[in-house]
């Protein structure tokens, strides 16, 4: 509907479809709009550039107002058939499986990460971005995985450290997306680089050292 908000059914790298606005796909879209605006200006297509700019401003403002919960950006789940927002306060609400919901996703700012690398600037409120990275460190970083349960792939174990794919400080969904309890280096590096852009050097290096310690050439290959 060209309101600047990524909606509907969104297939993603978690091998599932998210239903409803969420930061992972939302910020990718914001970055794409900013990039498209710059390309349009380079081609002297002022009409398309203006359209991209309008969609970006609308979408970015909406995400900061509706997805940012004071600590990080969350997912507003919609009905897979009607795409109406679900009332999560209703104990009888039927939530589709494999969603994120109020989870704190490790790569919720992946679009912002790429935007910084491409010189596109901030896609959302600067303070919200920094606060979100702090929350990822607060809620997703696990210093010792000895007592961590993971029914999926074990890329971290024992007394090793890392950033969880997602955490639910505000209450976990009954059936989250499949890989929520895992740790994956690519997603961790994404968060760490975001922290570096926000001058959060201590937090970034903590994450990077955890990766390098796990992939030290003896326990796992470093490549």
Predicted regions: what they are:
Residues 58-60, 124, 200-206:
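Beta-rich accessory regions
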Residues 28-46, 107, 111-124, 189-200:
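Well-ordered alpha-helical scaffold segments within catalytic/enzyme domains
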Residues 1-20, 64-184, 206-222:
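Extended glycan-interaction surfaces of carbohydrate-active proteins
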């Amino acid at each position: 509907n060209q309101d600047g908000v990524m909606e509907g059914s969104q297939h993603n790298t978690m091998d599932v479809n998210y239903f409803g606005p969420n930061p992972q796909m939302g910020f990718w879209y914001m970055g794409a709009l900013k990039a498209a605006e710059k390309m349009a200006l380079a081609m002297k297509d002022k009409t398309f550039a203006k359209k991209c700019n309008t969609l970006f401003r609308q979408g970015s403002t909406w995400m900061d107002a509706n997805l940012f919960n004071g600590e990080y950006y969350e997912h507003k789940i919609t009905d897979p058939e009607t795409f109406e927002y679900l009332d999560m306060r209703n104990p009888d609400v039927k939530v589709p499986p494999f969603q994120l919901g109020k989870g704190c996703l490790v790569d919720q700012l992946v679009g912002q990460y790429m935007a910084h690398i491409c010189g596109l600037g901030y896609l959302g409120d600067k303070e919200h971005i920094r606060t979100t990275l702090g929350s990822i460190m607060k809620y997703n970083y696990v210093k010792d995985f000895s007592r961590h349960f993971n029914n999926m792939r074990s890329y971290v174990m024992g007394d090793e450290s890392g950033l969880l794919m997602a955490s639910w400080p505000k209450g976990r969904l009954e059936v989250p997306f499949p890989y929520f309890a895992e740790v994956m280096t690519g997603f961790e590096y994404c968060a760490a680089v975001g922290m570096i852009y926000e001058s959060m050097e201590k937090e970034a290096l903590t994450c990077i050292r955890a990766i390098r310690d796990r992939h030290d050439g003896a326990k796992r290959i470093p490549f």
